[in-house]
């Protein structure tokens, strides 16, 4: 059974505090937007889909008990607080897309004279809660599409890697499972689907320095699921791909530009370079809400920079020399030329065909 990172019922929201994992499983109560902003910014909850879900649900929890005198006051509160939530972690596009969608809904409901203020609030709450259910369904579709693509690619290359039992070995980076989404996962959802099909021989996960999401979170999920899994250091990826017959790399995304350039957790770019050298397919698994057609390329993606302390300390223990300068970008951008395919809930697309394909899907 998948881990539950988000617990929600109308008027109540709790998130599994991921800063405490794997040592302690503790749920943090989110009472409203200010709490939502803090748990996102502090990375108590992380992963682009989960950020959007928790951000929107924190607003739902806040407005649920409120009585609004006018539709205008409700619309203003929705717009102002959603824009504030976007600022918590700006690189992940999912929160921005979800905010824009809900603001558009609020404006449409405001203009609809047949709906009163209570009806407007109810419709808004329903739409927010629907995002939670949709994310889980989308994750499952991503998993199915990704597993199919990887197995088909292996078959085209002449079968599973030498020495395997017909199943595949895959590498993933950072954390993209139930802890990063509403449930099931994106890239880890692909791994999960391979396991459900009986086609997962082994999964390797990187430690993902400096925040160690791979070691703390992905390894935690893999052990929980009892998948055959091995943790490797970020610096071992080249040796791993040379020695272990890895069939594919599959990672998540915080933002995908219209040309396929992909911003993901720092370290993703170098894995893609190494995968290209070793002729290992490199897949990005992401929902359509992670694709930003308004951005032509990766150079336009804002990269969040994190505090030096995340590099210089482990807990309260300093591991770097005092006085050393640090550069700590949370993400890097993998060029589309290094990406084999982008796995979405609506199919797997080559980066070159992404913009046209997604535009047609959105129009339909």
Swiss-Prot record:
Transmembrane annotation, as ranges: none
GO MF terms, alphabetically ordered: S-methyl-5-thioribose-1-phosphate isomerase activity
One Pfam family hit: IF-2B
Active site (UniProt): 254
Metabolic or biological pathway: Amino-acid biosynthesis; L-methionine biosynthesis via salvage pathway; L-methionine from S-methyl-5-thio-alpha-D-ribose 1-phosphate: step 1/6
GO cellular component labels: cytoplasm; nucleus
Known function: Catalyzes the interconversion of methylthioribose-1-phosphate (MTR-1-P) into methylthioribulose-1-phosphate (MTRu-1-P).
GO BP field: L-methionine salvage from methylthioadenosine
Amino-acid biosynthesis as UniProt keyword: yes
Record-annotated site: Transition state stabilizer: 174
Family annotation (PANTHER family): METHYLTHIORIBOSE-1-PHOSPHATE ISOMERASE
Name assigned to this protein: Methylthioribose-1-phosphate isomerase
Cellular compartments annotated: Cytoplasm; Nucleus
EC numbers: 5.3.1.23
Record keywords, A-Z: Amino-acid biosynthesis, Cytoplasm, Isomerase, Methionine biosynthesis, Nucleus
Main location class: cytoplasm
Class of this enzyme: isomerase
Superkingdom, natural source: Eukaryota
Catalysed conversion reaction: 5-(methylsulfanyl)-alpha-D-ribose 1-phosphate = 5-(methylsulfanyl)-D-ribulose 1-phosphate
